[in-house]
Amino acid sequence: MPVLLRNVAWIACVIYSTIPAFWLLIHPQADFWRSRKRSPYRILLPTWVAMWVAMVGFTAPWHGVAFYERRWTWIPAIGLFGAGLLLYKLSRNHFTLAQLGGLPEVLRGQNPQHLTTTGVRAYVRHPVYLGHLCEMLAWSMGTGLAVCWALTAFATVTGAIMIKMEDRELEKRFGEQYRQYRSTVPAILPKIIM
């Protein structure tokens, strides 16, 4: 496998794997971040970049170790890349860029806030996170890199914790409307409709 492709896969998985950790900084303390006079992103974004650097340092010793190298694994990987990109596109429908960027969670005065339960969100509550998972699985499957598989597992565990915290924060914000939505729509894996 070309070194450039291996390194792109590794860095992509490093960045994706830290997304749940980034949000774990936000959701338990959403009220704190909203109470700040200045944008909390001045603290949060450099902290997230520091997470990337730390994860690169931690995983660098084995970033070239592959479980396998098979060209055919790129066939399902391309399907996963496509699914991830489609989920990102569908996630934009009925959702503002501010919502996608998490501004209502951290900035005060981000009104009006409304719960979006249509489109792709009628099938899965967190389609962007599902898109991230598809992208990480695609890099892992296509490259066979141990580090990509490990980072995907790490993101899955931290993502599950983060989703629980985000659900609590959304329930606090939207109340019974969110409780009903959560009881009928799965978090990540959509129900298959036949």
Name the predicted role of every residue range.
Residues M1-T117, E135-M194:
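Membrane-anchoring alpha-helices and their flanking helix-loop junctions
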